[in-house]
Structure formats: structure tokens, C-alpha cells
From Swiss-Prot:
GO terms for molecular function: mRNA binding; structural constituent of ribosome. Signal peptide: none annotated. GO terms for cellular component: cytosolic large ribosomal subunit. The keyword Acetylation does not apply. Residues 97-129 have a biased composition (Basic and acidic residues). It comes from the Eukaryota. One of its GO terms (biological process) is cytoplasmic translation. Residues 133-142 have a biased composition (Polar residues). Keywords: Ribonucleoprotein, Ribosomal protein. Disulfide bonds: none annotated. This is Large ribosomal subunit protein eL24. Residues 97-155 are annotated as: Disordered.
Amino acid sequence: MKVEIDSFSGAKIYPGRGTLFVRGDSKVFRFHSSKSASLFHQRKNPRRIAWTVLYRRHHKKGITEEVAKKRSRKTVKAQRAVVGASLELIKERRSLKPEIRKAKRDEKAKADKEKKKADKAARKADKAKSAATQASKISKQQAKGAFQKVAATSR
């Protein structure tokens, strides 16, 4: 025996009972009574109508035994080494005091600044040297030379 479920109220529909409504998009709705069909056609929300199964579920009615809450597994952070830094190095850096950390950071920034400055000076000197060796710039057209007329060789 196939027992259907009411599309609106969620009630059971036994064989030989209820009506079918087929919408324009060919979706089939089954209704237990004209009452639920009427409310469906009025576009009422079954969660707001007190006697429907959806309302009872939504408002937690009729649940006798309290179901124990599902326990979610807590994620535990695990320290792992990263490429280029071992676990000991990471732990050591984490345990540094903020003042020491700031001093190290400033020192590194200063060293980077000096390196950048030296690099820029070297690049500038290199550019000046290359500019001195290249006396006059020649365009690509000049480098190719004047157009050479091909002599006829047929005679």
C-alpha cells in the first residue's frame, strides 16, 4: 500500500483519498483535503498554519524525548614546520619578547634599506658606464643602411 504525503500540510494520504493538482510546469501536488488545497492556492505559508506538520516541526511541537545535541569535533591546531623554517626556529621566534622582535625587525629593515641603496648605486654606475661606451645612438633604420637596388642579372 503506497501512502502519499500532502504537499501542503505534510499529512499522510491513503489510497483512494485526496486530489492531485498538476501545475503548468508539470509539477504534481497532492492534497489530503480541499482545506489544504485551498490554502495552497491562496499561497499561504504552511509553516504559519498551526495544524500542519511543517508548523509543528518548525515550532518543535510533539517532540517527546530530547535528542542529545550532536557534538562537533573541535579542531586542534598542530604546529608543523614550514619550508625554510624548522619547528624549533618557529617556536623560538614565537617566544621572543615584543621589544626584541621589534629591534630585530628594525635592524633587518635597515640592512635591507642599505642593500637596496648599494644596489641602486651599482646600477647607476653601470648605466653611466654603458652610456659612456655608446657614444651616439643609431636608429634601426640607420643601422640597416641605405636601400640597395638589386642589379638585374637576366641579361
